[in-house]
């Protein structure tokens, strides 16, 4: 056997080994998928704190919406509504962004914009967006409509909510 023939035999063995490794690698990918569960999102580390036994409990009294609405300020509401414009439009028949447009929302039926896909939580509500419903929704959307896709945490101050509602009522007449 000459050196040339020996080289051919060794090359054939190496080539066959390489092909076998490639076939094994591809077969593992196709028939043994990675079943590892991915952790989605992110975690927030929360420190445990000791419970203060001397803490006072703050009881939130019900808000008299008609009284708060009497002192509402539409100009202040205009400033607060700027937060809403990231996801909503105020224009008449304006485009739906992440949320539906807010033109003429006060007095409008809930989930009534036909070209917007509402979450199941909002679409099953029924009724109209009057002062009381808007007040409750703007205070804490996730409590008013559990399962809503609106990620806004809410407006904590009753006067700010009243200002926003008055602005939305008046905005229809401004345009």
Swiss-Prot record:
Provide the alphabetized UniProt keywords.
Cell membrane, Electron transport, Heme, Iron, Membrane, Metal-binding, Signal-anchor, Transmembrane, Transmembrane helix, Transport
A single GO CC term, please? Answer: plasma membrane
Ranges in the topological domain labelled Cytoplasmic = 1-8
Q: Where in the cell is it found?
A: Cell membrane
Q: What is its main location?
A: membrane
Q: Which GO terms describe its molecular function?
A: electron transfer activity; heme binding; metal ion binding
Q: Which domain of life is it from?
A: Bacteria
* Record's bilayer topology term: Single-pass type II membrane protein
Q: Which residues lie on this side of the membrane: Periplasmic?
A: 30-175
Which residues are heme c-binding?
Answer: 84, 87-88, 150
Q: Where are the transmembrane segments?
A: 9-29
Question: How is the protein altered post-translationally, as described in the entry?
Answer: Binds 1 heme c group covalently per subunit.
Q: Which InterPro entries match?
A: Cyt_c-like_dom, Cyt_c-like_dom_sf, Cyt_c_1A/1B
Q: Which PANTHER family match?
A: CYTOCHROME C (PTHR11961)
Q: Which family does it belong to?
A: Belongs to the cytochrome c family.
Q: What does this protein do, in the record's words?
A: May be involved in electron transfer from bc1 complex to aa3.
Q: What is this protein called?
A: Cytochrome c homolog
The species this protein was found in: Rickettsia typhi (strain ATCC VR-144 / Wilmington)
């Amino acid at each position: 056997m000459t050196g040339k023939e020996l080289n051919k035999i060794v090359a054939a063995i190496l080539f066959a080994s390489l092909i076998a490794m490639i076939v094994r690698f591809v077969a593992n990918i196709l028939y043994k998928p990675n079943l590892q569960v991915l952790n989605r999102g992110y975690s927030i580390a929360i420190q445990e704190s000791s419970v203060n036994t001397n803490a006072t409990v703050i009881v939130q009294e019900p808000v008299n919406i008609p009284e708060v609405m009497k002192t509402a300020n539409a100009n202040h509401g205009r400033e607060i509504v700027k937060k809403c414009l990231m996801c909503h439009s105020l224009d008449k028949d304006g485009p739906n962004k992440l949320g539906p447009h807010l033109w003429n929302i006060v007095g409008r039926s809930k989930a009534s914009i036909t070209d917007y896909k509402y979450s199941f939580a909002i679409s099953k509500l029924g009724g109209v967006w009057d002062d009381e419903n808007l007040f409750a929704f703007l205070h804490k959307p996730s409590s008013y409509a559990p399962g809503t896709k609106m990620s806004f945490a809410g407006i904590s101050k009753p006067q700010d909510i009243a200002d926003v509602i008055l602005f939305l009522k008046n905005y229809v007449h401004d345009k």
